């Protein structure tokens, strides 16, 4: 007969697919933008800020980790997560730079990196009729994800996200 510990143990194969956003979850996009712009990202018009970022060599691949996000990455890494991130249509370097950042800072293979337009994220909310999990800082993405049948974790702090992951069986 199985003991209680064995009965409560979650089978990792039964866990849902796990997707993690990049900007403001793992890497500090807004801090990088502030460095380039000399002020907060939203304090200049869209065209000006994106032009400055696009002209700043190595912007994307040299972003710093978000505070505490290495701990988050270490937790999810053992579950072979996907990185699901929106690329900027205003900066042709964003796709390549994000791939470089991921290659330099994580062990997520290129085959598990999905860069899409923001509105396309929700199309990954389920897999073969089963809900997938998305960790994302942008509440609109979480709401759209959940409306499509997925499980959303609104990332506002590493400790909160880790707790929610644990509740889902990602120990």
Where do the language-model regions lie?
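Acidic, Mg2+-coordinating phosphoryl-transfer loop and its flanking beta/alpha structural elements
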Residues: 130-167
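A short, structured active-site edge motif that brings together acidic residues
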Residues: 82-95, 99, 103-123
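Short, structured coil segments at secondary-structure junctions
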Residues: 77, 109, 147-149
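Short catalytic/ligand-binding loop motif for oxyanion handling, primarily in non-cytosolic enzymes
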Residues: 27-30, 35, 81, 90-94, ...
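Charge-dense, intrinsically disordered terminal/linker segments
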Residues: 1-16, 25-27, 65, 71, ...
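Active-site neighborhood of HAD-like aspartate-dependent phosphohydrolases
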Residues: 11-57, 147, 157
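Short, acidic loop-to-helix structural element flanking the phosphoryl-transfer center
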Residues: 44-45, 54-83, 91-96
């Amino acid at each position: 007969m199985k003991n209680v510990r064995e009965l409560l143990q979650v089978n990792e194969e039964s866990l849902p697919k796990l997707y993690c956003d990049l900007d403001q979850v793992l890497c500090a996009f807004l801090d990088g933008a502030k460095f380039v712009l000399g002020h907060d990202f939203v304090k200049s018009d869209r065209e000006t800020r994106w032009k400055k970022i696009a002209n700043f060599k190595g912007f994307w691949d040299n972003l710093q980790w978000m505070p505490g996000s290495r701990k988050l990455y270490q937790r999810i890494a053992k579950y072979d997560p996907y990185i699901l991130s929106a690329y900027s249509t205003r900066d042709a370097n964003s796709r390549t730079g994000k791939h470089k950042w991921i290659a330099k800072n994580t062990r997520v293979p290129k085959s598990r990196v999905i860069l899409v337009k923001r509105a396309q994220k929700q199309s990954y909310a389920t897999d073969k009729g089963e809900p997938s999990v998305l960790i994302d800082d942008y509440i609109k993405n979480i709401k759209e994800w959940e409306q499509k049948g997925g499980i959303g974790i609104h990332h506002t702090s590493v400790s909160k996200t880790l707790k929610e992951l644990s509740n889902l069986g990602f120990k």
